[in-house]
Amino acid sequence: MAAPVLGGFFFYLHLKNMEPGRGTVIKSTGNLFIVKLEDGTTVRCGIRGKFRIQGIRATNPVAVGDRVGFEWAEDGMGGIITSIEERTNYIIRKSPKLSKEYQLLATNVDLAWLMISMILPRTLTPFIDRFLVSAEAYRIPVIILFNKTDLYGTPEVEEMNHLSSVYSSIGYRCMQMSLQTKEGVQEVADEMRGKVSVIAGNSGVGKSTLINILDPAMRLKTGSISDYHQTGKHTTTFSEMFELSSGIRIIDTPGIRGFGTIDIERAELFHFFPEIFRASKHCHYHNCLHLHEPDCAVKAGVESGNISESRYINYLMMMEEEQGKYR
């Protein structure tokens, strides 16, 4: 049962005696935010225009996961957010409409789950590595979760095993799951329990379905796969934190095609590829960018097979993206 939402004329009568409130943002829809108080009640909150533009280069300065302070609105229908507590971390993406702005997807995250699939829809490595770079930059632990394993033939199994080997060797934990057969679901639930998790991945990879299986009472809308484009139709247009009956808290994020490397200097990008960063300590030049420089330990690592070629190619791709794209 959903928590009650405060508001209405009867509540307005008591506003003058109310102290400013504090809570956690559990839902974001444009300029409207649902804030959950410690007692379980929820309050609809907005933000003042001047609060939105005070040096914040985000289209939404408040995001799901934020711990905020608010004042009760004069009309008695909710509150106005006035402050945001310092964040432990956050996940961002490029704004769909403003290329020089970014959109906060989630904050104060304990664990990020990157759901991927080798089929329907197939997740590409540039998507994976862009997400991992952002997670590294903002210090969010990641588990790579392979879904739809019941649909895999020999080529898909081989690709999954290869990617698992690549990312496990770097230090990322990889797990496998089939939402159709429920294989691996309990292991995922055990890992999520007691944490605030964010689930990211291409639309259609199974994010909403996973939440429904973990707690059938949620009944989230799920999308079908487009036969023509093999891309899931977007079913989540806002971010929301779900508190499941099993003690699991999940932030469901909008369907995304890629994450931006906002606030990461080009010369520092390799810092967020752990294996490239480790190898860089042996480069001849201390300011080596691992592009065309001589005596580059990173390029030597790629040639020897110690560094994944696909990872290095994705690094080069991100380095070559036009200047100013993420700034």
Predicted regions mapped to residue ranges:
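A conserved segment at the C-terminal end of the G1
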Residues: 208-220
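C-terminal effector/interaction modules appended to NTPase cores
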Residues: 14-136
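Conserved beta-strand/loop subsegment of P-loop NTPase cores
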Residues: 109-116, 139-149, 171-176
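Arginine/glycine-rich "motif VI" loop of SF2 helicases in the C-terminal RecA-like domain
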Residues: 133-140, 166-169, 278
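Positively charged N-terminal leader segments that act as targeting/secretion signals
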Residues: 1-10
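Canonical P-loop GTPase G-domain recognition
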Residues: 151-205
